Design a protein with these regions (language model features):
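Peripheral, non-AAA+ core regions of ATP-driven protein-machinery
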Residues: 1-218, 222-225, 331, 471-472, ...
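Short beta-strand elements
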Residues: 18-24, 283, 387-390
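Basic, amphipathic alpha-helical bundle interface domains used for macromolecular binding and assembly
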Residues: 33-44, 59, 66-76, 290, ...
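P-loop NTPase nucleotide-binding/switch module
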Residues: 170-209, 213, 240-295
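Walker A/P-loop
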Residues: 219-260, 325
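The Walker A (P-loop) glycine that initiates the GxxxxGKT/S ATP-binding motif of P-loop NTPases
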Residues: 221, 285, 307
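Walker B catalytic acidic pair
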Residues: 300, 306-307, 318
C-alpha cells in the first residue's frame, strides 16, 4: 500500500513542501530515498521505539520511503512525525483518508513525545499558502504557528495524540491566538527606561537623534560612564514594530529556534549584545545548515557591540556588507541562503587600552602609539558606516547624587515617532529607503542641502577641525534628522552645528588631545 503525508523543508526563510511517500511490500528491509541527512536516516530507530512504547507495532515488511522533491536535501529530525504516520497508515494501523488535509512536523522522542521544532512559523505560512486544512506541530510551537490565520493549528504532546486526532478517536480544538492582542499587549512594556539614567544629557540627545533617523552610533568613554546602560535602553525609545516587521522578525527567530515556549509574535524590537569573543559564523550566520547569526537576530532592532576594539578585526570587517545591504547571503556549494539584517548598529569603546585617556580623575598609562594602535583596530570603512560618534565622560559622585531622574523613555519616544512619521511620508514609494540613515547621495542633495549660511558653517568646521571627507554626507544626514525632530522643513545652521558635534573621531587631532 502506498501512503502519502506532507511536511516541509526550511532553507533560510524559504519553505518547500515535502511529500513523504511510504510503500510496504513483503520483506524486511528499510529503504530511504530523497536526500535525507543523518538525522532523517536515524529517524527509523526513534520511530520504532516510539511506536513500541505507545503500544503499536513497527511493520515487519520491506519499507520504502521517498521524500519528494528528491533533489532537495532534507535536514533535521522534524520529519519523524510525518514518516511515522505514513508507516502506520501504510500498515493499516490508522486510517489514511484524512492525511492529505494536514501538514505535519515534529521530532519523536523514544517515548513518543513530540520535541520542539525550528522554523514552525514559516512552515505555517507555507501550509496556508498550499491550502492545507490543518497543521500539526509540537505543543511547544502551537502559539507560534497559530498567529497565521485561516489554517487550523493543532499542538500535540505525543505521537498517540496525533493518532487520536487523525483517527477521530478524540476531539481536539485548534489553537487560537488573537494576533493583534498578542502584538499590542507587550509593545510598550519595557523593563529598562531612560529615566534611570541621571545626567549624560548630551549622550541621551545623541541617542535620540540616532533613534529618530535610524543612524548607527558609537560611544567613546571611560569605564563606568554609562555607555552600556544607555545602549540597553535604546529599544525603549525606538518606534514600535509594525505588524509586518513583527511577523518578519518572529520568522527569523523561529528558524533560529530562539522563541520562548508559549510565545507567539515578537512585539518589541530585538536587542542583541554578543560577547567580543564571538566567531564570524555566530555573528553573520552559517553552519552546514545555514542558520541566522546575531546580525539577523537583530533585524528590525539593535545590535550592540560593547568594547568594539576587543572584537576580532576580521569578524568586525564582515559587518561592512550587511550594514550597507541590510541583508546577508550565506553561500554553499549547491545553494545559498539570504537572511534580512536591517538593524541599528550601536557600539561602545574605551578611548585607549587602559580606558582612562583624557579622564580628569584617573591617570592614563598608555603611550600615544598604543592609543593609535588601539583606535586602528576599527577600520576606516567600518567607521564610515557609523553616522554618530559621541564622547561620554564619567559623572563624579557629587554631581550624580544631585542629578534629577532622567526624562522618561515614553516622552523621548513620542518625539522619535513624530520624526519617523515625517520620514515615512518623505520616502513613500522609494524602495529600500525608510529613514534618513538610508538616504542616497542624490537624496541628500534633495532633502538635506543646507542654505548658504549652513554651507559656510560646514566648510569652516571641516577646515578647522580637520574633518575627513567622508564626514560630509554623514553630517548632512544627521542634520536632516535633527531638523525632523524640530519639525523644520529645511536644514538650518543650528542643525548643522549639532550634527558636526557628533563627528568626534573624524577630527584629525582626536588621538592627540584629551577627551
Amino acid at each position: 500500500m502506498l501512503v502519502k503525508t506532507y511536511s516541509a523543508a526550511v532553507n533560510g526563510l524559504q519553505v518547500t513542501t515535502v511529500t513523504v511517500e511510504v510503500s510496504l511490500i513483503k520483506g524486511v528491509m528499510y529503504h530511504l530515498t530523497g536526500l535525507g541527512d543523518v538525522a532523517v536516516r536515524e529517524g527509523r530507530d526513534r520511530i520504532a521505539a516510539a511506536m513500541q512504547y505507545n503500544g503499536m507495532k513497527f511493520p515487519r515488511a520491506d519499507i520504502t520511503v521517498n521524500m519528494a522533491p528528491a533533489d532537495l536535501k532534507k535536514e533535521g529530525s522534524g520529519f519523524d512525525l510525518p514518516l511515522a504516520i505514513a508507516i502506520l497508515a501504510a500498515d493499516g494501523q490508522i486510517p489514511a483518508d484524512s492525511l492529505g488535509e494536514y501538514m505535519m512536523i515534529g521530532e519523536l522522542g523514544l517515548d513518543g513525545k513530540l520535541q520542539p521544532a525550528k522554523g514552525v512559523l514559516p512552515i505555517a505560512i507555507k501550509a496556508r499558502a498550499e491550502h492545507f486544512k490543518g497543521l500539526i506541530v509540537p505543543k511547544h510551537n502551537e502559539r507560534e504557528a497559530a498567529i497565521v490565520n485561516n489554517i487550523d493549528v493543532y499542538g500535540m504532546d505525543s505521537l498517540a495524540d496525533v493518532i487520536a486526532l487523525l483517527s477521530r478517536q478524540r476531539e481536539y480544538q485548534p489553537c487560537v491566538v488573537d494576533t493583534r492582542d498578542e502584538f499590542y499587549k507587550q509593545q510598550y512594556d519595557f523593563d529598562l527606561d531612560f529615566s534611570d539614567v541621571r545626567g549624560q544629557e548630551t549622550v541621551k540627545r545623541a541617542l535620540e537623534v540616532a533613534a529618530a533617523g535610524g543612524h548607527n552610533v558609537i560611544m567613546i568613554g571611560p569605564p563606568g560612564s554609562g555607555k552600556s546602560m544607555m545602549a540597553k535602553r535604546l529599544p525603549s525609545i525606538l518606534p514600535p514594530l509594525t505588524l509586518r516587521e513583527s511577523l518578519e522578525t518572529t520568522q527569523i527567530h523561529s528558524v533560529a529556534g530562539t522563541l520562548k515556549q508559549g510565545s507567539a509574535l515578537i512585539s518589541q524590537r530585538p536587542f542583541r549584545a554578543p560577547h567580543h569573543t564571538i566567531s564570524e559564523v555566530a555573528l553573520v550566520g552559517g553552519g552546514m545548515n545555514p542558520m541566522p547569526g546575531e546580525i539577523s537576530l537583530s533585524h528590525n532592532g539593535v545590535l550592540f557591540c560593547d568594547e568594539l576594539p576587543e572584537f576580532n578585526k576580521h569578524t568586525l570587517e564582515v559587518l561592512r556588507q550587511p550594514l550597507e545591504d541590510r541583508q546577508i547571503t550565506i553561500s554553499r556549494a549547491k545553494y545559498s541562503v539570504t537572511y534580512p539584517a536591517s538593524f541599528m548598529f550601536v557600539a561602545s569603546m574605551n578611548p585607549c587600552p587602559c580606558g582612562y585617556y583624557g579622564d580628569p580623575t584617573h591617570h592614563c598609562v598608555c603611550t600615544p602609539g598604543q592609543i593609535q594602535r588601539y583606535l586602528n583596530k576599527i577600520s576606516g570603512p567600518l567607521m564610515d558606516r557609523i553616522d554618530i560618534q559621541c564622547e561620554i565622560s564619567a559623572i563624579p559622585f557629587k554631581e550624580l547624587s544631585k542629578a534629577q531622574p532622567g526624562e522618561p523613555s515614553a516622552n523621548i519616544r513620542e518625539r522619535v515617532i513624530a520624526a519617523r512619521a515625517i520620514q515615512t511620508r518623505r520616502y513613500e514609494g522609494v524602495a529600500g529607503v525608510h529613514c534618513n540613515a538610508q538616504m542616497t547621495e542624490k537624496m541628500i542633495h534633495k532633502y538635506a542641502e543646507p542654505d548658504a549660511a549652513g554651507l559656510e558653517l560646514l566648510r569652516t568646521a571641516m577646515e578647522r577641525l580637520s574633518l575627513s571627507a567622508r564626514a560630509y554626507s554623514r553630517i548632512l544626514k544627521v542634520a536632516r534628522t535633527i531638523a525632523d525632530l524640530d519639525g523644520a522643513e529645511k536644514v538650518e545652521p543650528r542643525h548643522i552645528a549639532e550634527a558636526i558635534g557628533y563627528r568626534q573621531l573624524d577630527r584629525g587631532d582626536w588621538a592627540e588631545r584629551g577627551l
